[in-house]
Amino acid sequence: MKTIEVMDTTLRDGEQTPGVNYTADEKLIIAEALLRSGIDAVEVGSALISEGEADAVRRITQWARSHDALDKIEVLGFVDGTRSADWIAQNGCRTLNLLTKGSEHHCRVQLKKTPEQHLQDIERTVTYAHKNGLTVNVYLEDWSQGMRDCEDYVMALTAGLAKLPIKRVMLCDTLGVLTPHQTEEYVRKMHECFKLRFDFHGHNDYGLAVANSIFAVRAGAGRIHVAMNGLGERAGNTNLATLVVTARDLYGLSSNVNERALAMLSDLVAGISGVEPSANAPIVGRISAIQGCGVHADGDKKGKLYQNRLDPTRFGRKRSYDLGKTAGLASIEHNCKELGIEITPEQQRALLAKVKELGDQKVTVTQADIILLLHDIFSAKENGIKLLDYHFTLKKGAPPKVALQLCHDKRKFEARGEGDGQYDAFIKALRSVYADLPELVDYRIGISRKGTSGALTEATITWRTDGKLFTTRAVNPDQLVAAMNATMRMLNYIEFKRELSKAASAQT
C-alpha cells in the first residue's frame, strides 16, 4: 500500500477562517496533538504578522526541538529578500514555505511585476534563506488558474525554481476551482516535466478538495495539505479526517496518521477554534456514528447489515442508535444494553411508544432519558429529586451566590453555594448535598434562530460516571434555567438507575 505524506495547516491557513484566532498556548496544544497523532508536518503560522505569532512559533519550535521533531515544523514566508527568512530563523524554525505567484495574472496584477522580475526576487529570497540554514519549500499560489489560463508562465517559473535549492513545490488550487480530472491532468504534467517533489494544496469551494487531493496523489503528488475539520477561508481546506480515511479505504493509500486520534483532534480544534464541524460531517460529525432507523438497528443486531468500513471505534468513537420516532424495538434494546439495564418485552414496547410520542412532539430523547421515561411509566413513586425554588445573588465585584430549595422523595431541604459564575454556584450548592456528582465533561448552549431575545435555548451537558459518558438536555428561554434543568435530569437519571438496579437484584 502506497503511503502519502500529510502536512497540516490548521494553525496557518485554518486560522484564516473568519472569527478564528489562536493564542500561543492554543497553537502549542494543537501542534503537539497533531504531531503525536502522526502528522508528517505542521505549518504553524506566518512570518512577520504579529508578536503573538512569533511567541507561538518560538514555543512550538522549542517543544519540537526537545522531541526531535523540529524538521516537522514549517512557517509561511514571503518574497521579501531577508525579512521572512530572518524572522523564521530568529524564532527557532528551520523550514520556510515561500509564497510565490503561480499564475501570471496574480504576478502582474497584485505584484505589478513581470514574470522575470518575480523569479529574480524569488531567487534572492531562496538563496539567502538557504545560506542561512533554512529548508525552503515554494508555494505556487493560484497555480490551478495559472495552468488553465497561462500554462507557459507556470512552466517557465517552475523551470527557474528547479535550479534553486528548494525541497518541495506546493501546487495550490487557491480558489478551489479544479475538478478531480483537471487536478490529475495538471499535476501529471508537472510531475512528468520536472524532477521535483510536489505537494497539493486544495480548497473546498465546490466540495471537491478531498477528491482533488487523491487524484493529485495518483498523478504524482507526494504530500497533501489538510486542516482539521476543514478549517480555512470560505469553504475551507481539505479535511484531514475525510482525506486520510477515504484515501485508505477507497484508494489503498495509507498515511502515518493514527485514525483513533481523529475524533479527539476534531473535538480539540472545534473547542479551541469555536467552529464545530457539521453534525453529519464524515468520520467526526456529532451524528455520523448514529443510526436513526429502527430497521437499521434490527439489521445490525441480526448481522451488522447496515455497517460499512467506517466503524466508529476506528476513530475513538462508538456506534449508537437514535431514539426518535423512526426508532424500533432493536433501538430500545441496544440503548438499554448500553445502560446496563434489562427490561421485559412489555416494558420495551411501552418505552418505544413513549419515545415515538415524544418524537412527534419534536422532543429530543437521549440515552439517559430512557431511565427517566421508565421511571415515569412504571414507578408509582413521585418523581425523585425536584428543584422547588432558587434565588441567585449577582453583584458586581462579588462571586455569584445561590440558595436552593430541593425536594427528594417528599423530603424538603436547602443548599447554598457560590462560584465563578451562576451555574458554577449552582453546581457547588448541589455538591454540598450530593458529594458524588458525576464529572462534567462538556457544556453547550444552543439558541434557536428566531432572532429574538426570548428565543428558546437548549442546554446539552455531557457527564462521566463509572467511566461512561451520558448526556442530558433541557430547553428554556433562560439559558441558566435550561442548564439547571438539564442538571436535575442528571440527578434523577442517577437516582432512578440506582432504583432499577436494586429492583433487578431483588428479582434475581
Task: Give names to the regions the model predicted.
Residues 13, 17-18, 46-52, 103-105, ...:
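Short, small-residue-enriched loops and turns at beta-alpha junctions
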Residues 175-178, 185-301:
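Catalytic alpha/beta core domains of metabolic enzymes, predominantly
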Residues 3-4, 8-10, 251-416, 453-456:
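A mid-to-C-terminal "edge-of-domain" accessory segment
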Residues 48-67, 73-76, 80-85:
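N-terminal active-site wall of soluble small-molecule enzyme domains
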Residues 16, 29-30, 35, 364-482:
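Non-catalytic terminal/interface segments that mediate subunit docking, oligomerization
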Residues 469-471, 475-504:
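Mixed-charge, glycine-accented linear interaction segment located at domain edges/termini
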Residues 4-6, 16-42, 62-63, 67-68, ...:
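Alpha/beta enzyme core
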Residues 107, 225-233, 245-257, 315-321, ...:
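Short beta-alpha connecting loops at secondary-structure transitions
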